[in-house]
A protein has these predicted regions:
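Histidine/acidic-rich helix-loop-helix segments that form or flank divalent-metal centers
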Residues: 160-163
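Proline-centered turn/helix-capping motifs that create local helix->coil transitions or kinks
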Residues: 138-139, 183-185
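N-terminal lobe of the biotin/lipoate ligase/transferase fold
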Residues: 1-157, 167, 211
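Conserved phosphate/anionic-ligand binding catalytic regions in large, soluble enzymes, centered on
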Residues: 94, 168-182
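C-terminal accessory segment of soluble enzyme catalytic cores
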Residues: 148, 184-235
């Protein structure tokens, strides 16, 4: 069973969290490079981490995304009190804000499995199992990443959790964003994930009431450990 350091960062500026991810990821990458250069020397261990947080209002665009999917100019961003970043994860554009649970697993997949598609499916399954505990049936929507509701009905299918990751030398960063008590009106300012014919939803919207974020995080952590055969240790 692999040990993974867990930390809840609380409400944190997006850039600050991104820089933290970069630092942790780069540390592990450099350890792996050093180990390969000197295989006869004592091998250093990489550290896997799971970070949870919320962000102030921010739109992020992945490396394969289009600026056309941001429907605001610079003044518009100021009007809605939001920032914007072009970042190095996969995927298109999404929104992060208070009430949304963002998870950043920074894992050395060499210690788990070296299959990025399996990794994404495990993240999706973690969220699917968590939502089930709150009485919400969800699943995967063919052709798209993330977690969706009403996946059998194209007219009603709606996304509740977005995903976008980056992997270098099997070290992951970025991750998932689960809409819990999220202000969904912000999604009107973008074409979420570049998909213009599907809606977004949240746990609050589906249940008709706000949800305890700590309970959702506890469930996510439990299913993360089950799927990845990991032990979370508070950092």
């Amino acid at each position: 069973m692999q040990k993974v350091l867990y930390k809840n960062l609380g409400l944190i500026d997006y850039k600050k969290a991104w820089e933290l991810q970069e630092r942790f990821s780069n540390e592990s990458v450099q350890i792996k490079i050093g180990n390969r250069k000197s295989p006869e020397a004592s091998q250093k261990e990489t550290v896997s981490r799971l970070l949870f947080c919320e962000h102030p209002n921010v739109f992020t665009l992945g490396k394969s995304g289009s600026f056309d999917n941001l429907l605001l100019d610079e003044e518009g961003l100021k009007t809605v009190d939001a920032t914007f970043y072009k970042i190095n994860r996969g995927g298109d554009i999404t929104y992060h804000g208070p009430g949304q649970i963002v998870g950043y697993p920074i894992l050395d997949l060499d210690k788990f499995f070296t299959d990025i598609h399996k990794y994404l499916r495990f993240l999706e399954e973690m969220v699917i199992r968590t939502l089930s505990e709150f009485g919400i049936e969800s699943g995967r929507y063919s052709g798209y990443t993330g977690v969706w509701l009403d996946v059998e009905n194209p007219l009603k299918a709606r996304k509740i959790c977005a995903m976008g990751v980056r992997c270098s030398r099997w070290i992951t960063m970025h991750g998932f964003a689960l809409n819990a008590n999220t202000d969904l009106s912000y999604f009107k300012n973008i074409i979420p994930c570049g998909i213009d014919d599907k809606q977004v939803t949240s746990i609050e919207k589906e249940l008709g009431q706000k949800v305890d974020l700590n309970k959702v995080k506890k469930s996510l952590k439990k299913h993360f450990c089950e799927l990845f055969e990991a032990e979370l240790v508070d950092a």
